[in-house]
Amino acid sequence: MAMVLENSSAELLRALAHLSNKRGNFKDGAALKCAVELGIPDVIQKHGKPAMTLSELTAALPIKQSKAHCINRIMRVLVNAGFFVEQRSGDGKRDDEEESYALTPACRLLLKDEPLNARAHVLFTLDPAEMVALGSLSEWLQDDYPTAFETANGKNYWDYIAERPARNKLFNEALAVDSRLIATVLISEFKFVFEGLTSLVDVGGGTGTIARAIAETFPNMKCIVLDLQQVVEDADLEGTENLEFVAGDMFEKIPNANAILLKMVLHDWSDEDCVRILKNCKRVIPEKEKGGKIILIELVLGGQNKDHVTVEAEICMDMEMLASFGGKERTEKEWAKLFQDAGLSGYKVFSNLDSRCVIEVYP
């Protein structure tokens, strides 16, 4: 109590507001999930006008009209979170003027027709199983389960989604969207990383978005996508003359190649598991002098000139890895230790992809 009394009223109110905001951040996510599931961004986009009034919006949504009066409260949260802009039908001076809503650039990433839409990512990260895992951290810290996800759901993440085809599909869709963005940047900015290679294995490559882009850019390179049996079968994937899909387990065996590509794979795993994966990669590539290398696309925590939004995104991603996978985001020092423990000779970090970096690791 003495500590509280030492602070001014203004400081206490700011502290309380800060606590309330952080405690309530998950409510932004809940409102966002609701908007995506109801298709609110698409309804407003298809309206054909710069903004859509609240009454027009509620009439167009697939909801019980007896609950239509609640939509403005959900929209209020989303406006405050920066996903919509609220406008007034008149000059904004009268209280009875009806609200109308327009999309922000962030909201356009939630449109179904947007090639790089983030709908799947929103839905799978805000899945109840994910949220209850985050809410079980204190219990997990006191039990014997490897992850909070297992504490909350009774099984690990991979077994959980393997038993739920729709959830597994959503996960792979989210990865594919992310890969489309990364593939564009890789080919335009980091083409030199792949030049001279005759073969490459994309480990955990999912539906092959990145490998397909690489194979098209380098028609003389043989590209293989390695992923679990259910991923390869469920996606009904077709290869091309220089692109092949192989079902397998990176912990067991990886096909031989000049280079191995791992995009946002290692952050899902513990240090011990990462060392196992890297050692398996090292076994199937030639020595450095003959062009052998492992290509990582991963977050590298820390560094200079990162804005608050980027740092917050990195921290939140690390918390997700902690709760659901038992993995982690890593600093450059932590990456270097992993490479050393796996018996790799060196590495080079190239210009980053926002938070993520391209890292070449050598046998």
UniProtKB/Swiss-Prot annotation:
<dbReference type="GO" id="GO:0008171">
    <property type="term" value="F:O-methyltransferase activity"/>
</dbReference>
<feature type="binding site">
    <location>
        <position position="250"/>
    </location>
    <ligand>
        <name>S-adenosyl-L-methionine</name>
    </ligand>
</feature>
<feature type="binding site">
    <location>
        <position position="227"/>
    </location>
    <ligand>
        <name>S-adenosyl-L-methionine</name>
    </ligand>
</feature>
<dbReference type="GO" id="GO:0032259">
    <property type="term" value="P:methylation"/>
</dbReference>
<dbReference type="Pfam" id="PF00891">
    <property type="entry name" value="Methyltransf_2"/>
</dbReference>
<dbReference type="InterPro" id="IPR012967">
    <property type="entry name" value="Plant_O-MeTrfase_dimerisation"/>
</dbReference>
<feature type="binding site">
    <location>
        <position position="249"/>
    </location>
    <ligand>
        <name>S-adenosyl-L-methionine</name>
    </ligand>
</feature>
<dbReference type="GO" id="GO:0009821">
    <property type="term" value="P:alkaloid biosynthetic process"/>
</dbReference>
<dbReference type="InterPro" id="IPR036388">
    <property type="entry name" value="WH-like_DNA-bd_sf"/>
</dbReference>
<dbReference type="InterPro" id="IPR001077">
    <property type="entry name" value="O_MeTrfase_dom"/>
</dbReference>
<dbReference type="GO" id="GO:0046983">
    <property type="term" value="F:protein dimerization activity"/>
</dbReference>
<protein>
    <recommendedName>
        <fullName>Strychnine O-methyltransferase</fullName>
        <ecNumber>2.1.1.397</ecNumber>
    </recommendedName>
</protein>
<keyword id="KW-0949">S-adenosyl-L-methionine</keyword>
<comment type="similarity">
    <text>Belongs to the class I-like SAM-binding methyltransferase superfamily. Cation-independent O-methyltransferase family.</text>
</comment>
<keyword id="KW-0489">Methyltransferase</keyword>
<dbReference type="InterPro" id="IPR029063">
    <property type="entry name" value="SAM-dependent_MTases_sf"/>
</dbReference>
<comment type="pathway">
    <text>Alkaloid biosynthesis.</text>
</comment>
<feature type="binding site">
    <location>
        <position position="263"/>
    </location>
    <ligand>
        <name>S-adenosyl-L-methionine</name>
    </ligand>
</feature>
<dbReference type="InterPro" id="IPR036390">
    <property type="entry name" value="WH_DNA-bd_sf"/>
</dbReference>
<feature type="binding site">
    <location>
        <position position="204"/>
    </location>
    <ligand>
        <name>S-adenosyl-L-methionine</name>
    </ligand>
</feature>
<keyword id="KW-0808">Transferase</keyword>
<dbReference type="InterPro" id="IPR016461">
    <property type="entry name" value="COMT-like"/>
</dbReference>
<comment type="function">
    <text>O-methyltransferase involved in the biosynthesis of curare monoterpene indole alkaloids (MIAs), natural products such as strychnine, a neurotoxic compound used as a pesticide to control rodents, and its pharmacologically active derivatives, including brucine, used to regulate blood pressure. Curare alkaloids act as animal glycine receptor antagonists. Catalyzes the conversion of 10-OH strychnine to beta-colubrine, and of 11-deMe brucine to brucine.</text>
</comment>
<dbReference type="Pfam" id="PF08100">
    <property type="entry name" value="Dimerisation"/>
</dbReference>
<feature type="active site" description="Proton acceptor">
    <location>
        <position position="267"/>
    </location>
</feature>
